[in-house]
Amino acid sequence: MDFNYILEKIKNAEIIKCPFPHLDIINFLSKEHLQLISNEKQIHFEEKTTNDEVYKELVENGWKIQGFPGCTSSWNDYKKYSSGNPVENIGITFRLHNYKNKIIKKLLEFMNSNEFHKTLKEKFKIYEETTIISAIQKNLTGYEISPHPDIRQKCLTYLLNINNNSEIENLDCNTHLLEFKDKYKYIQEYWEKNKDVNRCWVPWEWCNTIKKNE
């Protein structure tokens, strides 16, 4: 299976500089590969009526709870929060560990390959030694992550959102690309001057949304 067209899309994409250097690649996957993922029952299964039914379906299909920012690692804690009315939402993330579809498995192997890794690094002129992790994840209802930069140990993030729910476009669950409001830009300046300081999450009201990625 040839996935090299993905490399060409990365190489040919223009680097957008605002609010920070990034790529915005429309139709990143071919129609064939997108349809394959959208129709795969291991990934997109029928709607369930209870949290426990969702959990059972996920576990039986090779998904495991994944530690992730803004999320709990306890299914019982997630159920407790999602069934009540907490002051703040709490989410939970699952990662797929066993791929039933051979083509999807090959796609993930490709997106963890040296060739894919090298193409991303060359695009953004990254010369340090790095590793790559590509995976399929699900963020369940309640997931929300406050504005944040990447942790210092991470030099690049890529995100491919795939959802076959036609209502998703009407929901505010897009990725926001942000910049600090003027009165908070001193924080960014401090981070830039102090590379040994880990950066933190900040409140939404400190930032302006420059762009939404759907």
Annotate the PLM regions.
Residues 1-18, 185, 189:
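Fe(II)/2-oxoglutarate
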Residues 93-112, 116-214:
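Catalytic core of non-heme Fe(II) oxygenases with the double-stranded beta-helix
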